[in-house]
């Protein structure tokens, strides 16, 4: 199961693409758009992946998941987001995220690795055979970017963004949003940034 809150922008985005969200949502087992207003509502992980995949196909927007994630921040994580916002420094906040994300996301794991001067904040889907995992990963990386900017302030930027999926035909939406070098077909989806940010006090 996953929280539905990170997908909260789906209905509005569909409308912006000229698509009535109600029939599409019902086809995926979601009663109506009101469901997205319940911050504590959940859905099966596979359902979320299928929904994002269908949205990308219907809108002819292969980076639909990225757009959804751009409109989400730590608040969509519920109690986990609250832990992040109350953390004294960046590494404490990220450790809270890594440790507690499984409370709301039973289909993927979040990790924080440090190698030399680099830190890697990543997201890995571990449920096999789920449709739309590329969309899910794009969404997660966009939310992660927003979380890091919230924790570190507007001067934070990743030194590289790594995405597991194939190189898209149009990388401009990714370049414009992440404002960092991009690496596709990566082993894991992750935000790479200087580890010197980790002991910094949070900017909340």
Q: Whereabouts are the PLM-identified features?
A:
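Alpha-helical bundle regulatory/interaction domains
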Residues: 90-204
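N-terminal low-complexity or simple alpha-helical regulatory segments
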Residues: 1-121, 143, 168
């Amino acid at each position: 199961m996953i929280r539905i809150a990170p997908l909260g922008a789906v209905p509005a985005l569909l409308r912006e693409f000229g698509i009535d969200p109600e029939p599409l949502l019902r086809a995926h087992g979601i009663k109506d758009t009101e469901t997205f207003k319940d911050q504590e509502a959940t859905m099966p992980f596979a359902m979320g992946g299928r929904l994002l995949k269908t949205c990308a196909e219907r809108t002819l927007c292969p980076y639909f998941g990225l757009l959804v994630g751009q409109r989400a921040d730590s608040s969509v994580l519920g109690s986990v987001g609250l832990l992040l916002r109350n953390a004294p420094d960046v590494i404490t906040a990220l450790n809270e995220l890594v440790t507690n994300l499984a409370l709301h996301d039973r289909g993927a794991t979040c990790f924080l690795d440090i190698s030399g001067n680099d830190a890697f904040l990543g997201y890995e889907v571990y449920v096999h055979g789920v449709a739309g995992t590329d969309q899910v990963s794009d969404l997660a990386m966009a939310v992660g970017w927003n979380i890091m900017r919230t924790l570190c302030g507007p001067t934070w930027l990743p030194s590289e963004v790594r995405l597991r999926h194939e190189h898209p035909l149009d990388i401009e939406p990714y370049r414009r949003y992440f404002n960092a070098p991009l690496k596709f077909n990566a082993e894991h989806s992750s935000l790479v940034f200087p580890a010197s940010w980790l002991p910094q006090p949070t900017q909340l």
